[in-house]
Design a protein with these regions (language model features):
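N-terminal amphipathic/basic leader segments beginning at the initiator methionine
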Residues: 1-21
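Mg2+-dependent prenyl diphosphate-binding active-site environment of isoprenoid biosynthetic enzymes
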Residues: 19, 23-221
Length: 221
C-alpha cells in the first residue's frame, strides 16, 4: 500500500462519514466545512491510523474510517483556529485563502468548534467495538487534543510570540502541539484494530504495538 492509496481511501471512505453527519446542517455551514477539508493536506494522521491497524493485520477493521475521520477533523479544526487573527493571523493555508478569509471569522470559529465535537461523535459511533474500547478512543483523542496535548502546545507557541525559545522549549512545544496528535493517530489505529492495551493504561495501546512516541515527528514537521 502506498501513501497515495491510503490517502485515496480516506477521501472515498472516511470523509463521506463527515458529509453524512452534516446532511441536515445549514447549506452555507456545510459548504464552509467542505472548503476547510478540501484545502490540500497530506492526510498524514489518518494514514497513520490505517498503518497502525495494518501492522496488526487488521486493515479491514470496521472502526478505522471513523477513527481516521475523527483525527483529521481535530487536526483541521486546529488549523482553522490557528489561522485566526487572534492566533497567527494567516491569510493563506496551503496556497488557498484561510477559512476566515474565504468566509468570515464567526464562520471559521463555528466550523472549528463543530469539527471538534463531530470528531468525538464519530468515535462514539465507531462500529465493531464495545463501549469500553470506544471510550478508550475518546480518551486518547481528548487527551491529545486538549490541555495535556495540542491546546497546551498552542498556548506555549502563542506565549512565546516575540521572544526566543530554547531548543528544549521548542521540542516541548512541538511534542504537544504536533506530536500528541501523531501519537493519538497510532493509538486510535491500534484501538480500532483491537490492540491490547498496557496494563493500567486502557486508553493507550501504543506500548503493545511498539509505536514511536511522535515527539521527533512533531519537531520535524
Amino acid at each position: 500500500m502506498t501513501l497515495g492509496t491510503d490517502r485515496a481511501r480516506f477521501e472515498s471512505s472516511a470523509r463521506p462519514l463527515v458529509e453524512t453527519q452534516l446532511s441536515t446542517v445549514a447549506p452555507a455551514l456545510r459548504e464552509a466545512v467542505a472548503y476547510a477539508l478540501s484545502v490540500g493536506g497530506k492526510r498524514i494522521r489518518p494514514i497513520l491510523v490505517y498503518r497502525a491497524a495494518r501492522a496488526l493485520g487488521r486493515d479491514d477493521a470496521p472502526a478505522l474510517e471513523h477513527a481516521a475521520a475523527a483525527i483529521e477533523l481535530v487536526h483541521t479544526y486546529s488549523l482553522i483556529h490557528d489561522d485566526l487573527p487572534a492566533m497567527d493571523d494567516d491569510d493563506l493555508r496551503r496556497g488557498q485563502p484561510t477559512l476566515h478569509r474565504a468566509y468570515d471569522e464567526a464562520t471559521a470559529i463555528l466550523v472549528g468548534d463543530g469539527m471538534q465535537v463531530q470528531a468525538f461523535c464519530l468515535l462514539a459511533a465507531a462500529p465493531g467495538l464495545d463501549a469500553d474500547r470506544r471510550l478508550a478512543m475518546i480518551d486518547v483523542l481528548a487527551a491529545a487534543s486538549g490541555f495535556p496535548g495540542m491546546v497546551g502546545g498552542q498556548y506555549l507557541d502563542v506565549s512565546a510570540t516575540g521572544g526566543a525559545l530554547t531548543l528544549d522549549a521548542l521540542k516541548a512545544m512541538h511534542n504537544l502541539k504536533t506530536g500528541a496528535l501523531i501519537r493519538a493517530a497510532l493509538a486510535l489505529g491500534g484501538h480500532a484494530a483491537g490492540a491490547p492495551a498496557r496494563r493500567g493504561h486502557p486508553a493507550d495501546p501504543a506500548p503493545a504495538l511498539s509505536l514511536p512516541p511522535g515527539g521527533c515527528l512533531g519537531s520535524a514537521r
